[in-house]
Amino acid sequence: RDRSVSRGLGDVYKRQAKYTANVTAIKTLKQIESEHRHATAEEQDILAHYSGWGGIADAFDSSKENWRREYAELKDLLTDKEYSAARESTLTAFYTEPYIIKSIYTALENMGFTGGEILDPAMGTGNFFGNLPAKMAENSRLYGVELDSLTARIAKELYPEAKIQNRGFERTKFENGTFDVIIGNVPFGDFKPYDPEYDEYLIHDYFFAKSIDKLKPGGIMALITSAGTMDKYDDSFRRELSGKADFLGGVRLPEDAFRTAGTQTVTDILFFQKLEFEHENDRNLDWVRSERVYGEASVFQAVSYTHLRAHETLSDL
């Protein structure tokens, strides 16, 4: 059966404990695979504690005296391909705390969503699936995408009934208008994925642009992204997005929201609803505009906080 995640990632937030939980999960996965069977409930509990390598780059650095044992252990445990992928993920693989995920689902319930076709386009091991409310899960079909092989294999053991693809979102071939909800924590950075249909977007904007197209009319996109999506002075992407979706609201998370995952990146949770028809008129587009703000944190800041409300509870949306 699918695994329900009840323990927070905070249980293993210390770097050494996180490393140990990850290695134990990988050893368990490899044993399961070598025996050509599915995970038991007890093994699923072990696998569910895998939380990626974000924040523990020292384990991949041979010059770190205090991490030499771990460095050698990983070189022995992982294949060359797995090792390279894990090392590269130390700056990008930050998993989402269950309390944040549950708040997003509460907001979706308040918006009237009771179940349907749900996609997580950057699923990790599937925390968004594991925290799906039971009643919503009964009426839903789950689809996930995960680039990293080890992570995707763990996700498949945790959620065998979900349809999970081990590839980048840019290599998926979902039909437009497929999903009722697209939810997740998208990667962010200063690089562009290769996708001829969406070749002008940085990675975080790319996930928004493609996700909107994959939603059914009236479908909802609830994504965690870097503050840059709403803060950047160039509003061309927000303007493009406004032609396809209504901005339902957003919450700026505290800087320490992902501290236990190893990062303090400023992030927003943004909710959009796909329009029935593109470029509908008579809608409030104030959220698209950005204004120059001179302050300690940033030169540019998008919109007013009547649209992006700092630290408010998602249940208010």
What spans do the regions from the language model cover?
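Single conserved hydrophobic/aromatic residue that forms the stacking wall/gate
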Residues: 2-13, 307, 312-317
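S-adenosyl-L-methionine
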Residues: 156-172
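Conserved proline-anchored active-site loop of SAM-dependent methyltransferases
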Residues: 102-111, 117-132, 167-197, 210-214, ...
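Flexible, glycine-/basic-rich loop-and-beta segments that form/coincide
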Residues: 259-309, 315
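Class I S-adenosyl-L-methionine
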Residues: 11, 15-158
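Conserved Class I SAM-dependent methyltransferase catalytic core
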Residues: 200-256, 269
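Conserved beta-strand segments of alpha/beta enzyme cores
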Residues: 141, 163, 246-249
